[in-house]
Amino acid sequence: MPRNYENAAPTQFQRLPEYHRDEAWIRAFLHRAEIGHLGHARAGQPYVTPTNFWFDEENRQIIFHSNIAGRMRDNLEHNPQVCLEVSETGRFLPANTALEFSVQYRSVMVFGKVTLLKADEEQRRALYGLLRKYFPNLEPGVEYRPISDQELARTSV
């Protein structure tokens, strides 16, 4: 008989215990993962938006950015509850019967509430963290122009 998850916490583990990962594995996975899928909703309509992100481990925050205006920003202002799913595909597993074919994958789901960063220095720190994740060998002011006040005014972090 299927389980009833209606009253279960979203973080309640649902897989076999041998597939459970500890905090260190989860943190390392969030640091190396390239793309996350941000689940958000508005007026009962769910949306999933692929996004790059930075796991700010020191502050236990997931940092991402979007346009200053748009559907995602509007949705998040009305309903800040989100879920970020991050995954990577493993091996494809053939079988002798169709229903036994499978795929291995690793994933993490993070549940939380979006908070828009307001202070310019907070935004800069977050954006530079995001840039360091994807372009670790490039330095602001050397390989690219530092983030300007005008650019900060055009983005949401």
What are these regions (language model features)?
Residues 80-81, 85-88:
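Glycine- and acidic-residue-rich phosphate-binding/metal-coordinating active-site segment common to enzymes
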Residues 8-37:
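Short, basic/aromatic recognition patches
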Residues 33-68, 84, 100:
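Short beta-strand segments
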Residues 69-74, 83, 92:
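Histidine-centered metal-chelating micro-motifs
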Residues 67, 87, 115-117:
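Solvent-exposed residues in well-ordered beta-strands and their adjoining turns
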Residues 30, 75-76, 130:
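A generic structural signal for nonpolar/aromatic side chains embedded in well-ordered alpha-helices
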